[in-house]
Amino acid sequence: VHLHGLSFFHIEMSEVASKKRVSAPSVGYLELLRSNRGFRFLWFGQVVSQMGDWFDTIAVYTIALTLTGSSRSVALIMVARFLPSVVISPLSGVIADRFSRRTIMIASDIVRAIVVLGFLFVRRPDQMWLVYVLTVLQLAFSAFFEPAKTAAIPSIVSDRELVPANAIASVTWSVMLTLGAAMGGFVAGSFGTNAAFVLDSLTFVASALLISTVRFPKRAERPKSKLTIGKALGITDTIEGAHYVRHRPRVLAYLLVKPAWGMGGGILTLLAVFGERIFPVAGKAATGIGVLFTARGIGTAVGPIIARRWTGETRKQMQTAVGIAFLMGGTFYIAFGVSRSFVWALVFLALAHMGGSILWVFSTVLLQKTVADNFRGRVFAAEMALVTLTMATSNYVVGELMDRFGISPRWVTAGVGIFFLMPGIAWFLTKQRWDRKERAVVPAKVQDVAQQLETERLEI
């Protein structure tokens, strides 16, 4: 008699043992860039594009504060940067799953190169409406670019390259923030904001040219079905994506990590206000803002590298790191808000954003490893929509707290830090529940196998 239960028992025990074994080591950063041409050129595009982004960002904040002198104008720019994604992401996710992600990225870069040149026409306070409109347009096309890029990365790197690939992307964003914020502040302060906008436009063109050299593998064809109005508008695909997430609690939890971080996103408005009112450098708001964003960039650059070395790359290790990262962000934002020393404020700001970059990279990898390719575009677009919604709301609330209610930027920052502690606590409680369920699974299966073996023995 063939003991099917024994075979099943062997498979289950093998799976348990495999979880205890150390996974194959991932590749090094330089090795990945040398050996993977597709990722290398995608990364080159990210380098030049994001450098220009920060030239643009510092210049826009400088224009708003110079023309209006109001922190509300900065908050409205933040809202204009975030809300397009909320509206467009459901459609952009469907498009990223239907069409060539390479083409989507190239087209988005070209359009953004044209849009940012519109900032050259803003010269008077009564033209601030144009700043908001151009910001909405620029970020609307970013809402097509980002989900396509994030969904495409697992297609051009192997599973063991996934963590270092996302770490490189995060570190690059951070380094470009550091260099771009510093250089953007210098260029805007020394040569004027128009120079920053022209440079940003050129970087979008360069990014499009670099991405055009990347060859993505052909994706599996979607099953053909009758075209309906719902399918044509992307409604059917959006509902399908929502159904996919709803029936996978872990995917939902991973998807909510960045939106939870985004609930404290009002810190971006606060950094602009701190740079102008509390920590101006040589009396210049643009330079003060640039230095603060530079400290933010340094923290986000080193966070994933340190976390990868200290915590490891298994699923459980990354889950633990996400919870710790939330607590880091909250604790050091509180310290930043109450710090009277500019130097210590920069240190605390960098440490807070170390936490932010850790949870950003690891939640991305957890999603990329868990979500099927034909759903990635919609899942990452939904994530982006939720992030931008929470960040837009947070920035608007922060602006109102300071302008309408007259609350000190320091107290608002400390409040943001306290708020950040709550998602960290909730994450650890959720992880604890997952761990209990996993520990209960194996004994239950072992008992089932034992009963099956006993039944087969009696039959013999």
Model-inferred region functions:
Residues L3-E454, L458-I460:
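Alpha-helical transmembrane-bundle signature of multi-pass membrane transport and export proteins
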